[in-house]
Amino acid sequence: MRTIVMTGGTSGIGEVAARQILATPDTRLLLGTRGRGQDGAESVRLDLTRLADVRSFVEGVNDRLGTSEIDALVLNAGENQPNGDGRTPDGFETSFVVNYLAHYLLLRLLSPRLADGAVVSLTTSGTHDPEEDTMLPPPRHADAALLAHPDRDPDRDAEPRVAAGRAYSAANLCTILAVRALALQPEVVAKNVTVLAYDPGPTPGTGLLRNAPAVANVAWRVFGGLLRRMVRRYNSKEAGGAHLGAIALGRVNPPAGRYYAAVRRDALTWLEPSKLARDDRVRDVLWRDSASLVGLQP
């Protein structure tokens, strides 16, 4: 029996991936959700804006696992905020927590339950890379303290939507750095765990822009097919979900030294992330400072 723990499996590419997982014999899916989950999945309550809820989710997963181990940990949830003013109950900027810090905490707390040869996948975005030239402003840094408390950042963008976009891209940069750091942890190395950053690319038809202005949200969700025909770089929700499902099911073997899996024109490719994402010093400082924010040792 293959056991998969997943966040972000109720809509968009995650919903497609979860259906694929649930259709696979001898596979068990534990799904973090704020509401109703997928039929056939074991739903465990999870609100990523609350770190206490993240810890409760881990307790629920551990209770359901019993003596079993996790064969795939798929952290796919994420969303874009309308501005940079949102704060979580812990006092941190919302986009930073939902798109990165909560998943960092999940990584730290669930890593001991990973099976030998397990797969860990964190969903990220090409917005982290200035060379991708996306619609969102690229990150300036991966300073966890400033991203958690952007009011302290002397270079914070004055325009709310620009600040929100940069918060999102910075959180996705942090995700890739965390993937690189996790792969170096002794318990992960000892278990021969595959750790990947998964970028589904721009994918109309998903709920990523649920917090955006109504016109943009409707266009993104409802007119996905038309947008894909107009902009060739856009991917389909079905392709993005199928690749994510294949990763979760252990059907993707990354080339040696590759960890950044990116969907481009519906095909899975292996790319180098941005220069900042490859900076070892930035990686190590982020891992340490993220631990401090969630009350753990590095």
Task: For every predicted segment, state its role.
Residues 153-165, 202-239:
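Alpha-helical membrane-targeting segments
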Residues 274-298:
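C-terminal amphipathic/interface module of NAD(P)-dependent oxidoreductases
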Residues 188-191, 208-212, 250-255:
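Glycine/proline-rich active-site loop of Rossmann-fold NAD(P)-dependent oxidoreductases
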